[in-house]
Amino acid sequence: MIEVVAELSRGPVFLAGEALECVVTVTNPLPPTATSASSEALAWASAQIHCQFHASESRVALPPPDSSQPDVQPDSQTVFLPHRGERGQCILSTPPKILFCDLRLDPGESKSYSYSEVLPTEGPPSFRGQSVKYVYKLTIGCQRVNSPITLLRVPLRVLVLTGLQDVHFPQDEAVAPSSPFLEEDDSGKKDSWLAELAGERLMAATSCRSLHLYNISDGRGKVGTFGIFKSVYRLGEDVVGTLNLGEGTVACLQFSVSLQTEERVQPEYQRRRGTGVAPSVSHVTHARHQESCLHTTRTSFSLPIPLCSTPGFCTAIVSLKWRLHFEFVTSREPGLVLLPPLEQPEPATWTGPEQGSRGSAFCTREN
Amino acid sequence: MYTLLSGLYKYMFQKDEYCILILGLDNAGKTTFLEQSKTRFNKNYKGMSLSKITTTVGLNIGTVDVGKARLMFWDLGGQEELQSLWDKYYAECHGVIYVIDSTDEERLSESKEAFEKVVSSEALDGVPILVLANKQDVETCLSIPDIKTAFSDCTCKIGRRDCLTQACSALTGKGVREGIEWMVKCVVRNVHRPPRQRDIT
């Protein structure tokens, strides 16, 4: 028996373009004094990163199987296929790297190997939606001679920052560390440089503050004004908005606002059926604020963007957008607001401004 | 009586099994050659798209029936780190197919060094070797005489075993059938490496 441990040095979340570092430790766990002790042999170990794509068959119509012929021996246990046994299809993978070859371990002996690979920038972000899933994994395969390959899989989360794909590491050595007290070796320079650039771009994109005002009306008049300062946010930030209801001619009894993502299958891949068309658009609510606001002249809300959610993105098959979804309960009788209404209040649904209407959320496009 | 008939049936229809190693540097086209062989010799085999073939780590296994012989191909990973595993398969094999990338002049000497190690191994004494100059569909590729010149150091090591250098394109299939048919003839007549033992009962 041989024990294999994979350790990611800084956690499982990465930015596309960053280098993933992993230490793989192989151990013969028998103590040296065991009576049945014997050395163990491994033919090879290899590591590879891949992105597996899976689509809901009821929502997404993928190209017919003829154009995508089967993988070579998809269930083969003798060749290293990191996506063996996984649902869906592998849409992106890095080249396999050999960690070691012809390894022999005495009882109690351990050996460690390091794996480093840059995450491709042309892939989608990690995403688990209603219609499609993009799942990244680092897979380590090991084999004894004449035995099946054993796979160890490490799930990853990959974030994609739009606009970084075009950036190249500058060739000159003029890049100085941001802090004079930090000394970086050459191998770390590119990584920290990329993370720094990403941070700067995110800061620039998400710190543009200018008040946007939207009038809220129903069929009979003005309800109020919605104000928001930013349209580009980072994961973990709060979406802050203000509502001014004091100047409305229509009384608002209650309102709710939801922070949602909209997952939309691109038109050419939508599943169409004669009857019972499955939805090609689905919404997920990440945060919600509800308030009774009779006699309220001014209020505000704050909706946190979950750290585990996915920034907006667009691929050939699916797109994800962020939005604020409002619902208002208005009164028909402005003069009789103190009395219970004779009729049921009429809910008026109005979709507020979409996040990143000029592009995906967290995009770096200049306003 | 049933046992006798069953044994007779198996004896008449059994196929001799021969193991053939497919060796060569990475990206020479070994797995593409294997896929092309399976497509050409197995009627019901639905081949995969050759453009989807990626780097092999480990062992691709393929089986091809040619007449009374059954060839079991073992397509091994060709990366430099994996070449030290090749010799673990020498003792059990009946033939070797060595694939060369005819378009990669820069790595031709590297390929020759790997080939030299293969033919120098005592475990492969008397084993027929088919050398495939692959990617001959590319216009700028090296010709057979060019490749033979580059590999001339190895001729004295080939000794008395059968050896054939064949131009081929695993992508288009040219030369694949001829190479395999030659290999079948060689392994069948090689009395020093009988086919794998099979229990008739």
UniProtKB/Swiss-Prot annotation, chain B:
Record-stated family: Belongs to the small GTPase superfamily. Arf family.
BP-aspect Gene Ontology terms: gastrulation; Golgi to plasma membrane protein transport; intracellular protein transport; protein localization to Golgi apparatus; retrograde transport, endosome to Golgi
Subunit: Interacts with SYS1.
UniProt-listed InterPro entries: P-loop_NTPase, Small_GTP-bd, Small_GTPase_ARF, Small_GTPase_ARF/SAR
NCBIfam families per the UniProt record, alphabetical: small_GTP
Protein name as annotated: ADP-ribosylation factor-related protein 1
Any single GO CC term annotated in Swiss-Prot or TrEMBL for this entry: membrane
Record PTM N-acetylmethionine, positions in chain: M1
CDD domains, per the entry: Arfrp1
GO terms for MF: GTP binding; GTPase activity
Subcellular location: Golgi apparatus; Golgi apparatus, trans-Golgi network
Free-text tissue specificity from the UniProt record: Found in most tissues.
PROSITE patterns registered for this protein in UniProt: ARF
Signal peptide range in chain numbering: none
Keywords: Acetylation, Golgi apparatus, GTP-binding, Nucleotide-binding
Gene3D superfamilies the UniProt entry points to: P-loop containing nucleotide triphosphate hydrolases
Binding-site residues, GTP: 24-31, 75-79, 134-137
Gene name for this UniProt entry: Arfrp1
Known function: Trans-Golgi-associated GTPase that regulates protein sorting. Controls the targeting of ARL1 and its effector to the trans-Golgi. Required for the lipidation of chylomicrons in the intestine and required for VLDL lipidation in the liver.
One Pfam family matching this protein: Arf
